[in-house]
From Swiss-Prot:
Name of this chain's protein: tRNA (guanine-N(7)-)-methyltransferase
Binding site for S-adenosyl-L-methionine: 86, 111, 138, 161
Keyword Membrane attached: no
Assigned protein family: Belongs to the class I-like SAM-binding methyltransferase superfamily. TrmB family.
PROSITE patterns membership: SAM_MT_TRMB
GO cellular component: tRNA methyltransferase complex
Top-rank taxon, per record: Bacteria
Pathway: tRNA modification; N(7)-methylguanine-tRNA biosynthesis
Swiss-Prot/TrEMBL catalytic activity: guanosine(46) in tRNA + S-adenosyl-L-methionine = N(7)-methylguanosine(46) in tRNA + S-adenosyl-L-homocysteine
Functional description taken from the UniProt entry: Catalyzes the formation of N(7)-methylguanine at position 46 (m7G46) in tRNA.
Amino acid sequence: MMHDDPNEAGLPPHDDAIPDEAAEGADAVNPLHHRRIRSFVTRAGRVSTGQRRAMDELGPRFVVPYAPELPDWNAVFGRSAPRILEIGFGMGASTAEIAANRPGDDFLGVEVHEPGVGALLKLIGEQDLSNIRIIQHDAVEVLEHMLAPESLDGVHIFFPDPWHKARHHKRRLIQPPLVAHLVSRLKPGAYIHCATDWQNYAEQMLEVLGAEPTLENTAADYAPRPDYRPVTKFERRGLRLGHGVWDLVFRKRAA
């Protein structure tokens, strides 16, 4: 789940409120990691009437139920097109804007936060978007079971939970085992684009992505924000206050 603007990305993280024992329990054993890394933290949130209506009316078409098997994604989207995975789309405003501006690409958004799913479905209906599909499930399991090797043209991970306390850094999403698994799902030449407003997390992302031998950085270190990534209201406000935002864009080396 994106962590930043409540209007853009659901509720912000509150790892001050997560006891160590509870956080430990959230990290069940997984083949990807010695300690389970989830792509989300479950948070309470109210689904609005409009979001619920969108879920009821548009969910059957645009929400893909999780199943531990490979779907026929061309059939799911109704065409064969470049496919971009987004992990944690928050309230979906950026996802919808990117999809609207890139109609030739298909976008698979993975998010567990129900109000966020409803909000993106509402935007899909309002903007008549056909190139988005949603899975409401843990992205790690989606990667493991629903995406074939070398099937993705890109991955977007924008403003993931920073887990800012040092003792919680091990719960951050961008870690070597997950990155290796992501890379296995990328076609040669495909990209991973991450963004964060936490400098410490940006430094970790740069180190982890840079250490993956099958990836190459498209910049000397941090990349200029690509034109396709919208600037959120929260981000714009932070920039006015002098806060930093760091984008990283890496590509998978050709075989």
